[in-house]
């Protein structure tokens, strides 16, 4: 430990430099010799040098004296990482971190925090992260590990810090090895000894492999003393209740059983490095043999107050098999033994049992092979040897264990055994969807229905097509002179959405409408039909037309006099992307045909950590206050994930990590939180939405771990409500930077959307059919993903009229135009000459651009680039989130909310509907006026040459002729300069009346006087 002595205060600031990861090589040999230099006020301390190490571990404490603790929040720590160049006695910059003094906590409350190294200047080459712990203390640090450095001896200080004795290095290595050995030798004696020594927190070293690109995360062991541990530090992005907050959770790799990180990092731990470690006790009951039981046999696991029971097995065999896994949270274990009972049927008395001491249970760390079950002798009620044996395996593990997903959890002990499947975590896949294009061209020799009438009747023939529940109709065939009435001609394209596997058929029915009426009414009579299996339809990936075919029509009356047939062209279009989400929230834009997919450009990893402050959703007997049975659903591309349901908790912890392949960075991932209504309730109940979060991947930096608390905001008829906060850890990894940058130059949608575009109304109808297909498929899964969940995740109602959304979009447009308005105001300020110096500089710049017009575009582009570089340092470090202020959810009126939640068609009373109709009329009237004014200005431009006003057109033509002569004789530069100077002339040379040109334009006629 290094200490800087400045002053006589007792308060000390301790900065513990733990380690760094993935540093930039600077020595020319793909390595670096890093050290850390920390500066606080006028005190500067540094760690020892780690030669040839891009992932150094220091575990050194630097102590700074604080004169005024109250002034600490106005100061900052400067942490710089350098590479030591021994040959030239100089150093290279590797990165820096600036820590505000307001974020420094007290001793015992701080945790190790991971900081991303920042650049010192624009051209600095920096990468990597550094793990630092900082806190205030009043305890004097004494011992042989403390090195005191005087501020006055600058050169001596450097020599003392750099020249670390070899005995000290060997001693630190021995201490690190002892810590690693103590991690693997987990027993109670070590815990009791740590309690006697009064250790609050111990830092464990972590040695990652240099080839891995995962961020270094070092966590602190929880205090062995009773009581809750330190909470993660939270940094708010604003004072609003609906703001985004940055968190610092203890993320890590494989746990060693003591709550820390092991010194190695394996494949499984790297796949769970975005979640917090959760320790569990696993009990796997496989089977039994040689039991002397007459009735049905069950096995029971008892751990303190927790009790889990297996399914009943028939007594036909003396060797029953269960193959069930029970999981108990280690943080809630209140017993020293776990008991396994074998019972007969529903009897309370057991026939035998097996006991395990928790201190002797091993710890399994993936990717170790599963623990092999063993046979254990069953004890009778008297403690003697009973009849039979029980095959079980018991071990400690984490949520990374393979048995975790399908196991019975102790927190779900109150859930009925038949409902356990509805609370498990699952991964779903959306069905592979295709657009089915059917071109109804024509029909021949259709049997026309005359209904016994002697009068000549013109048939009204149309075609009805049905695929599953989707029904579309063509228009009534129009009369063509070259074709008879029995040969109708339509030539219409109809689109359907179908899902693999193709089990449905296309039913084509030719109908004749009798006695008038609407199409599809009771007067339509089928005159022929044909069924075509979808599996026989030809697939296409481009815009090349497939061949058309003739199909025979069955008229149903065995009348062979007419050989009716219909001409169709059917194709499964794989070149389109079947839209199931709103265009602005697309999570996948790939076409259906796999051969058209672009290569993968990255990997998206999301750690769903926990939720806090959830709103109670139900009241359950025996529970004080409301509770919630919450789970999360994340959707990106065709992959849906569902976390397990945490029962009876308003602050659930999931700590589940999922991965998606990224094919386009300009996509959005959606994470929703729901209350499981199927837990101890009616299975037909609908899950209640709690809130959701959208994250656009293009706003994320590659390789950076984003740990934030996202507000869950739901709009109710009574107003906007915050229903809780969702804690996520998100990382976007880039496999090939060139491919990712190349994606920005490609069209957003596949080629077919531009060569053969679909109409807006058709896309909306197809999107609704796609939603039905996805919801129907996911609702048949186990556990089912309800339709209400699918609709909420896919934003099925984003197109519904809302006064609130209209205001939000209007002010978004105003915000976009505000830049142009600001430029116009700036020019007006220059014209007003209220600031003569600025106006003079502006005029000189204008004349410079007139004299050298070839510099105009380069200067403009250079200025744009400079603005972008200047804004880089002030860029937002937080990903965008749902903003209640931008959505105008905080200032919306109650009646506008009630209108937004109204059904379609409306279900409100007459007076309410009339009031809303009058309000819409008032708004539409103002819009109508603005549109009319814009049309009038355009019509005045057209009137310049229309001779509607002969005198105005004559004057305009004379002006054009004179202007042509003037522009031909006078140089362009001189013309532009004179025009600009005339426009920028001081106010004393201007008059307040409108210009003659503007007055002339306003006198031109428009078509407004022709309106009724």
Curated annotation (Swiss-Prot):
InterPro entries in the record: C2_dom, C2_domain_sf, C2B_MCTP_PRT_plant, C2C_MCTP_PRT_plant, C2D_MCTP_PRT_plant, MCTP_C, QUIRKY-like
Disordered: region residues: 141-203
Biased composition (Low complexity): 161-180, 188-202
Name recorded for this polypeptide: Multiple C2 domain and transmembrane region protein 10
Pfam families reported in the protein's UniProt record: C2 (PF00168), PRT_C (PF08372)
GO molecular function: metal ion binding
Residue stretches making up the C2 domain: 1-115, 262-376, 411-551, 585-710
Topological type in the membrane: Multi-pass membrane protein
Subcellular location: Endoplasmic reticulum membrane
Entry similarity comment: Belongs to the MCTP family.
Function: May function as a signaling molecule by regulating the trafficking of other regulators.
Origin: domain of life: Eukaryota
Tissue and organ distribution: Highly expressed in roots meristems, shoot apical meristems (SAMs) and in incipient leaf primordia. Observed in flowers.
Organism: Arabidopsis thaliana (Mouse-ear cress)
Sites where the protein binds Ca(2+) 1: 296, 344, 346
Coiled coil: none
Transmembrane segments: 810-830, 841-861, 952-972
Binding positions for Ca(2+) 2 per the UniProt entry: 344, 346, 349
Stored SMART domains: C2 (SM00239)
Gene3D superfamilies: C2 domain
Cofactor dependency: Ca(2+)
Cellular component GO terms, alphabetical: endoplasmic reticulum membrane
Biased composition (Basic residues): 148-160
Keyword list, A-Z: Calcium, Endoplasmic reticulum, Membrane, Metal-binding, Repeat, Transmembrane, Transmembrane helix
